[in-house]
Amino acid sequence: MREFSFLRKSPDCVSVFILLYSIEEIRKGGFFRMNITVYLGANEGNDTSFRQAVEELGRWIGESGNALVYGGSKSGLMGALAASALAAGAEVTGVEPEFFISESFQMEGLTELIVTKDIPERRTKMIELGDAFIAFPGGTGTLEEVSEVMSKLALKQIDAPCVLYNLNGYYAGLKALLRHMVEMGLSTEEKQEKVSFAENLGDIKAILGAEK
């Protein structure tokens, strides 16, 4: 987990002992705290079930003891997600490019706000912070973000679950496209093995191994 990243720099016997002891204690409790990076739209959309589902997702992140990483905006579905996660006690990290800050899009009350110079740096930082990735319904920006995650998974540059929240069939077309890529020999099941589709929050819990 991210709490033990210091071991990459200077592992020693004491540090390894602490790590192993901590992992054992966490396993006894059956829970690993995750930074869950969520990609989603800054608009509401015209399906009222989106807001209800995103608030449910935010509440679960907080109530389960996990932390949220998202794009930092107060607008639309992004704002609803952050507000519900904060209300449920989650640590919430927003990652926003500086030109959004100047336009006052940032959410108030975040645990941490990270400002990046541009969109590419924002994508990099959100991946760097995440232990798991969820793509909620969103627009082309959301598609760009989750596509980079899938690409890095295929190249084995990261190793983490990537869940596309197929709410009301929103990502059915993308699911079919990914399958078609395999059929046409342009991708493989191995390259897509970390990519999953969830129909509801229960599916997400099961995929992330956090069903309680």
Segments (PLM) and residue ranges:
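Short loop-to-beta-strand entry elements in the cores of soluble alpha/beta enzymes
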Residues: 160-168
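A cross-family phosphate/adenosyl-ligand binding-site feature
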Residues: 33-129, 167-202, 209
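Cationic, low-complexity basic patches in intrinsically disordered or flexible, solvent-exposed regions
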Residues: 4, 10
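Short, structured loop/turn "capping" segments at alpha-beta junctions
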Residues: 92, 156-160
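Active-site/ligand-binding-proximal alpha/beta "capping" segment
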Residues: 123-155, 163
